[in-house]
Amino acid sequence: NDRGVAHILEHSVLCGSRKYPVKEPFLELLKGSLQTFLNAMTFPDKTMYPVASRNKKDFFNLMDVYLDAVFYPNITEETFMQEGWHHELELPDKNITYKGVVFNEMKGVFSSPENILDRHLAHSLFPSTTYGFESGGDPEAITDLTYREFKNFHNKYYHPSNSRIFFYGDGDTLEYLNFLDNEYLKDFESIQIESAINAQRRFSKPKRKIIFYPVSKDESLDKKTFVVVGFKLDKSTNHEHCLAF
């Protein structure tokens, strides 16, 4: 759906965990580690938590903080409201408004006509798949997300059986794997998680869609129309087919 649960969860797991119950461990790592890369990103079909460091001790510490955040986050209801959405009243005579880190972020994203166009194109080409929805969250739908749905999403999908863990660089892979197993993976049983993505079926005829985007009331409407044509290609593993386009 368009409620942005994966995006809100990406923010929320980095707001304290079992071993690191501080408010924002992500910011603490940015300030106090030797990291060369530290981030988290939500895509329509996955969420990534990459870390990098050229210092071995620091790298293991980064791994520990991130693994604990992913598999054992606190994700309290207060965190959900902070990172997702909540009601806010600035003054008694003002209207109640919606606020939230992800809610505000996506309002900014949806203020760009290019972003709106790009998203509607993907959603129109793949309506029956996860790519047909706004993984970051549509501000008009984010406020429908409940704390229970938020928690259930983590319980269902944030499991080692539904993950891919990659190491890259000149390091001792066996040492990394032993750390993973001894500190985290040994505590989980292998389970079956249904997260496969089915291919979008071809359309019987071309689809046409008119969408709208906002402009300020003082802004001219001249030369503000966009036209885009999109094609659904074969799987990306069919290199010749994709290269032809």
Sequence positions of predicted segments:
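Non-catalytic beta-strand/loop surface segments
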Residues: 1, 19-57, 92-96, 100, ...
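Active-site recognition of the HExxH zinc-binding catalytic motif
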Residues: 3-15, 245
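Extracytoplasmic/secreted envelope proteins and their assembly/folding machinery
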Residues: 6, 23, 27, 60-63, ...
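Structured segments of extracytoplasmic/periplasmic soluble domains
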Residues: 11-16, 65-73, 105, 109, ...
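M16/insulysin-pitrilysin zinc metalloprotease superfamily fold
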Residues: 16, 51-98
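Helix N-cap motif at beta-to-alpha junctions
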Residues: 54-58, 169-174
